[in-house]
Swiss-Prot record:
Protein name: Nucleolar protein 58
Biased composition (Acidic residues): 440-450
Domain of life: Eukaryota
PANTHER family in UniProt: NUCLEOLAR PROTEIN 5 NUCLEOLAR PROTEIN NOP5 NOP58 (PTHR10894), NUCLEOLAR PROTEIN 58 (PTHR10894:SF1)
Length: 511
């Protein structure tokens, strides 16, 4: 007999096929193109209903993973009495798992079986008694949502999409703030040009405009909340002798409107920066401790997600953000870039020019470890201890390269070695006095001088003998060389004579 195992949102269904070799049919699509043909071919043999939505989700996950659950195993044991029966299964993994159970089935799962499943799924409500099309569609929708939630394992605190959008908005805000501030300084500069040189901060400049208005009111206006006392005095003095033109109230109203936008944007930027910092500490605490919130957020945004960044090797993280320079270098066969977005990290910034590349490489390696812990660790805390340890190691390496202590993370306190105290030695005054030389000592000195003279004479004699031997050896070598050369000349002469005789003989024979 041939059975078809069908997984539905309501439960497992075993359909009995009237044709034993239906999976070998060449005209399968034509044989199952209508509901009558499908109902004639398949009859329900057994049905195992799911008890709840949670049970349905559990069984669906086991099918996806290619595992045989206890509920499915019980269903298959009911029909194992039929000898030499064939079981048609949709998933290859599931077919392999059923084979391992040791049941008397010939399990089949190939491309042809997909056509059978296509026909069964189309007319499933008619095959299952007591199940309407509407009920099955509702169950399928609910199960699909459950599987989706299970796969995503959704957690609002761990969504890295928020980081990607926040860092993009932060960059846009910086550009807008710079543009607005430049426009405001140029606009108000016609009325009070000296103010831009005294006050360089854009937000403080905008707040002064909103508080003071026209420059003639500078002496009456209190700017102590915005500026230090010294700079406030300079502003008021410059306002009295300013070379700027006069402006109307309408002009001032429009300038004030722009200044309000700058102050509001600056306040929102600070709020967004705090939000991004909190999000980064929740999602990637170790990366945040190592490279900072902004650099970490830019790395995540550039790669697309925290998971894809965690899967990247250290070499990719090192040059992330410098793709154009990398491909240009490869094309022109020049040196490849040493760093990308990591250049803006504080640790790389502390290094001198020659050491920036080395520190970027070390930092990228540590960042890869921290990222994998942040993204893939099952049980992790948000303290960022691994990031702090990695940062301490990078700082130690930086200190070694720079030759000075650049560590900012707290040092490990170790116990000092115990020092044993010993008694001070007394000074020996007798060591400073020299004894008078005795007669025996003078005699021994004479004997030593005689020995030295004898040694020198012997050494000279040996040197003379060595020089004679070397001359003799050189002469023998020269004689051998001359004899060899004479012998070679003689052999060459004999060969030449033989060759000439041979050639003469050949000529005579030809004649």
């Amino acid at each position: 007999m041939a059975y078809v195992l069908t997984e539905t949102s309501a439960g497992y269904a075993l359909l009995k096929a009237s044709d034993k070799k239906i999976y070998k049919s060449s005209s399968l699509i034509q044989d199952l193109d209508s509901s009558d043909k499908v109902l004639k071919e398949f009859k329900i043999a057994a049905f195992s209903k799911f008890n709840s939505a949670a049970n349905a989700l559990e069984e669906a996950n086991s099918i996806i993973e290619g595992k045989v659950s206890s509920q499915l195993e019980k269903l298959l044991e009911e029909i194992k009495k039929d000898k030499k029966s064939t079981l048609i299964v949709s998933e290859t993994k599931l077919a392999n798992a059923i084979n391992k159970l040791g049941l008397n089935f010939n399990v089949v799962s190939d491309a042809v079986t997909l056509d059978i499943y296509r026909a069964i799924k189309e007319y499933l409500p008619e095959l299952l008694p007591g199940m309407s099309d509407n009920d099955l569609s509702k169950m399928s929708l609910g199960l699909a949502h459950s599987i989706g939630r299970h796969k995503l394992k959704f957690s609002a605190d761990k969504v890295d999409v928020m980081i990607i959008q926040a860092i993009a908005l932060l960059d846009d805000l910086d550009k807008e703030l710079n543009t607005y501030a430049m426009r405001c300084k140029e606009w108000y500069g016609w009325h009070f040009p000296e103010l831009a040189k005294i006050v360089t901060d854009s937000v403080a400049y905008a707040r002064i405009i909103l508080t003071m208005g026209i420059r003639s009111k500078a002496s009456e206006t209190d700017l102590s909340e915005i500026l230090p006392e010294e700079i406030e005095e300079r502003v008021k003095t410059a306002a009295e002798v300013s070379m700027g033109t006069e402006i109307t109230q309408t002009d001032l109203d429009n300038i004030n409107a722009l200044a309000e936008q700058i102050v509001e944007f600056a306040a929102y930027r600070e709020q967004l920066s705090n939000y991004l910092s909190a999000r980064m500490k929740a999602i990637a605490p170790n990366l945040t401790q190592l490279v900072g919130e902004l650099v970490g957020a830019r790395l995540i945004a550039h790669s697309g997600s925290l998971i894809s960044l965690a899967k990247s090797p250290a070499s990719t993280i090192q040059i992330l953000g410098a793709e154009k320079a990398l491909f240009r270098a490869l094309k022109t066969k020049h040196d490849t870039p040493k760093y990308g977005l990591l250049y803006h990290a504080s640790l790389v910034g502390q290094a001198t020019g020659k050491n920036k590349g080395k520190i970027a490489r070390v930092l990228a390696a540590k960042a890869a470890v921290s990222l994998r812990y942040d993204a893939l660790a099952e049980d992790r805390d948000d303290s960022g201890d691994i990031g702090l340890e990695s940062r301490a190691k990078v700082e130690n390496r930086l200190s070694q390269l720079e030759g000075r202590d650049l560590r900012t993370t707290p040092k490990v306190v170790r116990e000092a070695k115990k020092v044993e105290m010993t008694e001070a030695r007394a000074y020996n005054a007798d060591a400073d006095t020299a004894k008078a030389a005795s007669d025996s000592e003078s005699d021994s000195d004479d004997e030593e001088e005689e020995k030295k003279e004898k040694k020198e004479k012997k050494r000279k004699r040996d040197d003379d003998e060595d020089s004679k031997d070397s001359k003799k050896a050189k002469k023998e070598k020269k004689d051998k060389k001359e004899k060899k050369e004479k012998k070679e000349k003689k052999e060459k002469k004999e060969k030449k004579e033989k060759k000439e005789k041979k050639s003469k003989k050949e000529k005579k024979e030809k004649k």
